Every structure is written in C-alpha cells, then in structure tokens.
From Swiss-Prot:
Superkingdom of source: Eukaryota
Entry function: Putative transporter for the divalent zinc and iron cations. Required for the development of liver-stage parasites.
Coiled coil: none
Gene expressing this chain: ZIPCO
Knockout-associated phenotype: Gene disruption results in reduced sporozoite infectivity. Reduced size of exoerythrocytic forms of parasites. No significant effects on parasite growth during blood infection. No significant effects on the numbers of salivary gland sporozoites during mosquito infection.
Transmembrane portions of the chain: 1-21, 46-66, 74-94, 158-178, 183-203, 218-238, 243-263, 275-295
Listed name of the protein: Putative metal ion transporter ZIPCO
GO function term, MF aspect, one: zinc ion transmembrane transporter activity
Naturally occurring in which organism (per UniProt): Plasmodium berghei (strain Anka)
Membrane topology term: Multi-pass membrane protein
Pfam families: Zip
Cell compartments where the protein resides: Cell membrane
Length: 304
C-alpha cells in the first residue's frame, strides 16, 4: 500500500513539473539568445520521438496482447487507430477554419470603423454602418459566448486529454491491482520513465493552445490526477474493463502516431539547425525505445 502511494506521489509531482515548467522556461528564454542545443524546439523533438517509440513499443503491443487474450482480430486496433488519426485531422481543419473566421470578422470590423470616420457627414451611410456594426457586434458576442463550448468539444485538445486520461487511468488501475513488491516497482518505474512524454504532449496540444485559463487548468489537472486516481480505484477493489482499455489504448496509440509528426510541423529547418533537429528526434526515439525494452524485459523476468 505504501509503495503504491509513494509511486502515485512521485508520478503526480513529475506530471505537475513537466506540464507547468515549459511555460516558465519559454518566458525566461524568450528575450535571450536561442541556444543551439538547449531550446524548446529540440526538447519538443525529443518528446515527439519518444511519443513515436511509445506508440510502437508500449501501447501497440499492449493492445495486441489484449486482443489476442479476448480472441479479437487485430484489424479492430488498426481500425480505431485510423479513425483517431482521421478524427484529429478533421478537428485540426475545424480549428483552423474557426481561427480564420474570427480573423475575417476582426478585419471586417476594422474596415467598417475606417469607413465610418470617412463618411460621417452622410446620414444614410452612417445609419447603414450602424446597422452593420450592430450585426457584427452581435456576431462577435455570439462567437465569444460559444468559445468555451468550441474549445471544449470541437478542438482536438479535448479528445487528446480524454483519451490520455483514460489510458493513464487504466495504467493506474494496473499498478493498483498488483500485489507483489517487485512487479509494482518495475511497472512504476516504467510509468515514471515515459509519463514525461505524455505530459509534454498535454502541454503542447492542450494546455498551451487553450486560451481560457480555467479550461487549460482543467485539461492539465485531469491528466495529472488520472494515474493516482486509477491507483486509488484499484486499491478500493474496482476492476477495469479490458474492452474499454482496448478501445481507448488504440485511440491513444493513433493520437500518439499523429501527434509525433504534428508537433514538429511548425519547426523551420535551416542549415544551421537541421542536424540538431534530426538528432533530437532520433535521440527521443532511441532513448524511449531503450527504456521500454529494458522495463519490459525486467517485468517479464520478474527482476528488479
């Protein structure tokens, strides 16, 4: 019981630090000269590579094992992965479309304001502009009132957090359901070794992109508390559903594959930084792959 509690506290602290520390680092280095190696782009590349390794070495084999255990075809997993990748593409398109619409409304309002100043002497035109301004104001207020709903249900941040919350919750159930000391230590260390990459994904794709501070905090703390909550539920003797684990682990695997490449799309590659960008991504893949292989071996060998 105490060992599980210690692991839950360590992972909780790790998640808090990794989710909230990058924003402070970015604000400090914003006005400083960019370092060739130690900068946010390279750190994000390491995380992207680690996420790719997690998808192939940790999550996909886990799902395939559950499918074999329940005599289900592997195409179920690949179908869910394909659906999740397609879904994130659609939500990205919707998000970009929403951003463009907001920009168009702002530009229209600015142009109308200029037209009002230049034509103030004409009463008919002024009345027409007043009506147009009122319409724009109503439209803008409607957009503002719907922002919370849009950010919650139409951006991919919500679905990323939901999927990773359930996946992390199930990992907590796994730790909480173990009885022997050695497996608890091995599985716990494995969680600690890869949880930072998931935290960076939450920060990059949910916390950082969400303008509403309350919603951003909800996203962050939902994921931070997911694994300790899973441990608590398992300790209280609630069993997990393997079919639910198959569904959400497959979806999370698709999210990992998509986000591994999506997180690097805004990086500009130049002659000066292309080596560091390639090396950091390769380092993330190799480092996480090595960790997962070692912990999987220890878990199967029952050696600490």
């Amino acid at each position: 019981m105490w060992l599980k509690l210690i692991l839950a506290i360590v992972i909780l602290i790790e998640c808090i630090v990794v989710i909230y520390l990058p924003s402070h680092i970015e604000s400090r280095i914003m006005n400083k000269k960019k370092h060739k190696i130690f900068n946010m782009e390279n750190f994000e590349n390491v995380a992207s590579g680690a996420i790719l390794a997690l998808a192939f070495i940790h999550m996909l084999p886990e799902v395939i094992g559950l499918l074999n255990k329940n005599n289900l075809t592997i195409y179920c997993c690949f179908g869910l992965i394909l659906i999740s990748v397609t879904f994130l593409n659609i939500t990205d398109i919707l998000y970009d479309h929403h951003t463009e619409n907001c920009s168009d409304i702002d530009n229209a309002e600015k142009n109308t304001n200029k037209f009002t100043i230049n034509s103030a002497s004409d009463k008919n035109i002024r009345d027409h502009i007043d009506i147009e301004m009122e319409s724009l104001s109503i439209k803008e207020n409607t957009n503002l009132s719907n922002n919370f709903i849009f950010d919650t249900f139409k951006s991919n941040a919500f679905f990323i957090v939901l999927s990773l919350f359930i996946h992390s919750f199930v990992e907590g159930l796994l730790i909480g359901s173990l009885k022997d000391k050695n497996p608890i230590i091995i599985v716990g260390l494995s969680m600690i070794a890869h949880k930072w990459a998931e935290c960076l994904m939450i920060y990059k794709n949910a916390v950082k992109k969400t303008k509403d501070p309350i919603l951003s905090s909800i996203y962050a703390w939902s994921f931070i508390l997911s694994l300790p909550l899973g441990i608590l539920v398992a300790v209280l003797s609630f069993s997990s559903n393997e079919f639910v684990e198959i569904i959400f682990s497959s979806i999370a695997c698709g999210f990992f594959l998509y986000l591994s490449f999506n997180m690097t799309k805004d990086i500009t590659v130049t002659k000066a930084n292309k080596f560091y960008i390639s090396f950091s991504y390769f380092f993330g893949v190799c480092g996480m792959s090595t960790l997962m292989i070692v912990f999987n071996y220890l878990e199967k060998s029952n050696v600490v």
